[in-house]
Amino acid sequence: MITLDALNEYDALTVWKSHLAGVIEENPFMQKDLDNIKTDPKAFQRLFEQVTNRWISGEHDRESAPRWKDFKARVTKGLRTIMDGHGPGSEIAVVTSAGTISVVMQQSLGLSDKKTLELSWQILNSSVTRFRYNGDRIALSGFNDISHLDATGNSDFLTYR
């Protein structure tokens, strides 16, 4: 087993702290969601979507905060390290998070940043996504498979965060 920091999730807490005030300033009506964040899970999701949309736009980048383009570059480098180290046809398991998976999906499907972010909201914890690599490109071969969780009969295992 090896560990590649390049495939770690983005620092969501720092992204949140870096962009939340701007989201509220640009959308004052969202203050209500912030006020209800501890009692309404949907309020958090609405705010977090706005925070991450602001983040991926790149229009509010600061040196002191993570940048979307840097996250994508890091994941791409990590993916390249795996592909170069194992070659086409190898079977490799990578355990990571929705943000990282969505960036690889973006590369394999040619998605925009916005669609990539939207896709990331659909990725279930512990789901399995499969890719194939032929030496030139990476292609999606399965997405968000939860059959191993369904087999337990316990829907409590189906979570998004």
What are these regions (language model features)?
Residues 1-6, 32, 44, 48, ...:
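Conserved histidine-centered catalytic loops in small-molecule metabolism enzymes
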Residues 1-49:
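Phosphate-coordination/substrate-recognition cap region in phosphate-metabolizing enzymes
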Residues 2, 112-137:
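Domain-level recognition of soluble alpha/beta enzyme cores
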Residues 12-18, 107, 152-155:
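Short aromatic-enriched loop/helix-cap "lid" or pocket-rim segments at secondary-structure transitions
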Residues 56-70:
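Surface-exposed cleft-lining segments at the edges of enzyme active sites
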Residues 82-90:
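Glycine-rich phosphate-binding loop signature in dinucleotide/nucleotide-binding domains
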Residues 90-96:
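Beta-strand elements within well-structured catalytic alpha/beta cores of enzymes
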